[in-house]
């Protein structure tokens, strides 16, 4: 026997696949026949079923958006123009969450592009960041008619997608803009004035509630309190004030 012929040759992958299939069929037959002394449990059969399968690709913003598709899960789909998923840095340290798209967002399919978006841009600039540094999204992805507050059934449908977005981005901080965003993420039925001014915990992420930019447009006297909230975020992010 030559040296080359004595080397161990790799076993084709199809051999292992066939072996797994044979073991699975044998154990299933034994389980159905009432045989004892062998592990024919559903867990073992399930383990064998998954052997050799490629692991599912990791979750991404693209897969979440694909899962949303042309969403028809709640009544907001009847009046929307565009679904507004979110935009910004997919690895952002700071994520802003609003309640839902407005008129301009619905027309353009992008978050915070109307007058509230201009106000938010000024806030982002004031904390020495840009839109490219942060991620922007909303609790609900479709505009509520006449910009009303999202209803509980609409939030219940959309919230799991927001939670998945947050899990993928893994920000260090979340700024919840307005009562709907803060209450939805924190599960606390308190007014935004009672929630703001301090950090809360959201699954290990520091969450700061503050007033929504649209609210500030109509109540400019609340800008000072909002700035105090943003300064707390700046300090925690290590930015000089």
Residue ranges and their predicted role:
Residues 2-3, 14, 21, 25-241:
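A polyanion-binding, active-site-adjacent surface
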Residues 1, 6-9:
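Intrinsic-disorder/low-complexity detector
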């Amino acid at each position: 026997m030559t040296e080359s012929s004595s080397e161990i040759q790799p076993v084709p992958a199809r051999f292992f696949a066939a072996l797994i299939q044979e073991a699975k069929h044998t154990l299933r037959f034994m389980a159905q026949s009432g045989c004892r002394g062998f592990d024919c449990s559903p867990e073992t059969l399930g383990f064998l079923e998954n052997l050799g399968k490629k692991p599912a690709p990791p979750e991404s913003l693209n897969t979440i958006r694909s899962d949303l598709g042309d969403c028809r899960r709640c009544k907001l789909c009847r009046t929307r123009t565009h679904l507004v998923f979110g935009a910004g840095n997919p690895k952002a340290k700071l994520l802003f969450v609003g309640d839902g798209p407005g008129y301009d967002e619905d027309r353009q399919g992008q978050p915070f592009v109307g007058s509230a978006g201009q106000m938010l841009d000024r806030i982002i600039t004031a904390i020495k960041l840009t839109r490219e540094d942060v991620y922007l999204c909303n609790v609900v992805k479709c505009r509520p008619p006449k910009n009303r507050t999202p209803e509980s059934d609409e939030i219940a449908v959309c919230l799991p997608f927001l939670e998945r977005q947050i899990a993928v981005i893994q920000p260090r901080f979340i700024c919840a803009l307005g009562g709907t965003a803060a209450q939805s993420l924190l599960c606390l039925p308190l007014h935004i004035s009672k929630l703001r001014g301090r950090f809360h915990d959201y699954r290990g992420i520091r969450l700061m509630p503050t007033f929504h930019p649209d609210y500030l447009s109509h109540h400019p006297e609340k800008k000072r309190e909002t700035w105090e909230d943003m300064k707390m975020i700046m300090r925690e992010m290590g930015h000089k004030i």
